[in-house]
Structure formats: structure tokens, C-alpha cells
Amino acid sequence: MAKKDYYEVLGLQKGASEDDIKRAYKRLASKHHPDKNQGSKEAEEKFKEINEAYEVLGDDQKRAAYDQYGHAAFEQGGGTGGFGGGFGGADFGDMFGDIFGDIFGGGRGRQRVVRGEDLRYDLEISLEEAVKGTTKDIQINTLAHCDSCGGSGAEKGSKVETCPHCHGSGRIRRQQGFFVSESICPTCHGSGKKIEKPCRSCHGEGRVHKKENLSVKIPAGVDTGNQLRLAGKGAAGENGAPAGDLYVVIHVREHNIFERDGSNLYCEVPISFATAALGGEIEVPTLDGRVKLKIPAETQTGKLFRMRGKGVASTRSGYAGDLICRIVVETPVNLTSEQKELLHKLEESLQGKDLSKHAPKSSGFLDGVKKFFDNLGKSDK
């Protein structure tokens, strides 16, 4: 009897996308699964047919061979011109058995043991917490061993035997021509076990969804994007396998005063017009509290002051960066008539021949403008 076209089995056209193939397989496999159609030989055969089609169409290499040669690509010794001979009747299953055993966590007759999944948790902290270090309590959604059955998946007193179909490996290996493929055992769903009476709490899975509370110690100096690995705090493994890890990804909130660049902190410090001209002493904020900073006379906007060791300590070297303060001279606003009059008098006293002495930048700028227009006038003549 001729085999059905694999695309037809999955209800697809030949040009179907990878996602279309996956969706069709999941839908049909669920519909015709033996557990949902107990005692139905027709459903069992259909399920095998669906798995066989997906094993080929779900693999890029096999699909390409099938598209070119059809079922002949997977018949022993035929279809691909050159692959049929040269191996002296070698058993490809034996040749690749060890490889597949390593990949899928067990060889023939051994129960499949799968490490638990790694989990990710995104944690937002303040800049102060990032710089100083802290401890945060978090709650994660994870898979834990079922307390009712101890992770076995079986009710107490129920027999747990090796799956007779896959002999405990959890996978079925098939040889099709020069291809060797493995798929999850449809009888035990990959567990490698045959359970007489599945646990009612976990439905035979051995694991249950659970919320778990953890305390995470955040070291000083972390930054956005840093990951903290908590070994063994991920999802529980299957069949007694070790749990995965939990990765806590740090996100540092923006600060209303400081900006961070590596180990250095930056902030803008406004000072009055008078302090900028005459000099004085001001207080600037740091993450350790207020610190006094001397402002020399004639300080301009943009002047940088470096406060060494007031930045962030490196998580590797422990060396602390600096706090860099950028001065911004603030123009006075909401002036009274008297204050405006005083400023007019000051402006008048600074004008004239002494402008270059009191305002060198303004004087230089005005001289540059005058020369520009003088040269412009000469070029027009």
C-alpha cells in the first residue's frame, strides 16, 4: 500500500512554513492521541502517521530530501543516487546510537533524565541599592517536585514500571534509509515509565506549578543588565534530575539627581550669579550625604569639579569611581525694580574699554562679529 503524502497527512500545502507545520502537528497529535482515543486502533495508526510525517517535515534536511525525492529518500539503498552503497550493509542505528543517547539524555534501556529549565526574573532596584548593595525578597513562578508523590508521578502504593515501548529511554528511534531519527515515546510521553495509577495532584507529571519566595543578595556595584545566577533555584528536573538555575536580571531605575556611567556618577549643580562671580562654598549631594564644595571666583557654566571616591565601587576591583559635578550658573528671575536697577548699574560699569577684562568671552565674540561684517562688506565692493 502506497504511503500518503506527508503534507496531506498534516493537511498542508507543499510550501507550508515551519510554524504552519508545527501548529498542524500539535493540533492533530492532540486530537488523535491514544490517551484520548483509548481502544481505537484507527486513532493509534493515525497518531503514528502524524508523528512520522512531522519527523520528516519538521526537520529541514529531511524535508529538503523529501521534497526532492519523496518517500524514496528514506527507503534503504534508494532515491538519492550515491547514498545507497559504500557502507557494506552497516546499521545506521548502531552507528549513531551513542550520539543520540548523549543528546537526549540516555541510551537504550536507560530512563530519560532531563535537567530542570532555567528561569529568568527581572528585578528593578534603585541607584542607591545598586551602589550600596541590598537584599531583595522576590516571588517566582516555578515547577517544583510534587509533594504528594515525591516527584515519582504515581499515587502511593501504585506500581511504576519501565515503559515497554521505549524500554525506559523515553524516546523511540527510527531508521529511514540513511536517516536515523528519534522522537518522544507516545506511550510514556518521554518519561520512560509506565505508571499504574498516576498521582492525582500532578496528574503523573511528578512536578507541579508553584509560587516560591526567595531572598536575593544584591552585591554593591551592580548595573543594569548584570545577571545574578542562583544555582539550583530554577524549575525542578524530571525523573529526579537536578533543578535548573534562576537568573536574576538587574534593572536600575533612573535617578532624579545622578546619572551613572560605569563607576562614575554625574550631576548638575546650580549656583547663583553672585556665587559664580565672587566665589563661595556650597553643599552638593552624594550617595553618602552632603559634602561641601568650594567654588572659586569667576566660575563659568560647564566647569567640572571631580570628587574622588564618591562614585560607584567596582564589583570586580572594589575601586570606587568619582562624582563629577557640572556647574550651571543660574540667571536670577522675578527681580524687583531695585534689583533690576542694581544690575543695570553693574552692566554699565562693565561696558566700554574694560569689557575684555571683565567679560573676555563676550568681548572676543563681539570682536569676531565686527571682523566678520567688515570682511563681508569688503567682499561686496
Swiss-Prot record:
Coiled-coil regions, chain positions: none
Subunit text: Homodimer.
Assigned protein family: Belongs to the DnaJ family.
Name used for this protein in its record: Chaperone protein DnaJ
Biological function: Participates actively in the response to hyperosmotic and heat shock by preventing the aggregation of stress-denatured proteins and by disaggregating proteins, also in an autonomous, DnaK-independent fashion. Unfolded proteins bind initially to DnaJ; upon interaction with the DnaJ-bound protein, DnaK hydrolyzes its bound ATP, resulting in the formation of a stable complex. GrpE releases ADP from DnaK; ATP binding to DnaK triggers the release of the substrate protein, thus completing the reaction cycle.
GO biological process: chaperone cofactor-dependent protein refolding; DNA replication; protein refolding; response to heat
CXXCXGXG motif repeats: 146-153, 163-170, 185-192, 199-206
Superkingdom as given in the UniProt entry: Bacteria
Principal place of residence: cytoplasm
Cellular component GO terms, alphabetical: cytoplasm
Cofactor(s) it depends on: Zn(2+)
Domain J: 5-70
InterPro entries listed in its UniProt record: DnaJ, DnaJ_C, DnaJ_domain, DnaJ_domain_CS, HSP40/DnaJ_pept-bd, HSP_DnaJ_Cys-rich_dom, HSP_DnaJ_Cys-rich_dom_sf, J_dom_sf
Entry keyword set: Chaperone, Cytoplasm, DNA replication, Metal-binding, Repeat, Stress response, Zinc, Zinc-finger
Disulphide-bonded residues: none
Residue numbers binding Zn(2+) 1: 146, 149, 199, 202
Binding site residues for Zn(2+) 2: 163, 166, 185, 188
Zn-finger (CR-type) residues: 133-211
Comment field on protein domains: The J domain is necessary and sufficient to stimulate DnaK ATPase activity. Zinc center 1 plays an important role in the autonomous, DnaK-independent chaperone activity of DnaJ. Zinc center 2 is essential for interaction with DnaK and for DnaJ activity.
Family matches, as PROSITE patterns: DNAJ_1, DNAJ_2, ZF_CR
HAMAP family: DnaJ
Pfam families reported for this sequence: DnaJ, DnaJ_C, DnaJ_CXXCXGXG
Localization annotation: Cytoplasm
PANTHER family reported in the protein's UniProt record: CHAPERONE PROTEIN DNAJ, DNAJ HOMOLOG 1, MITOCHONDRIAL-RELATED
MF-aspect GO terms: ATP binding; heat shock protein binding; unfolded protein binding; zinc ion binding
The UniProt record lists the keyword Acetylation: no
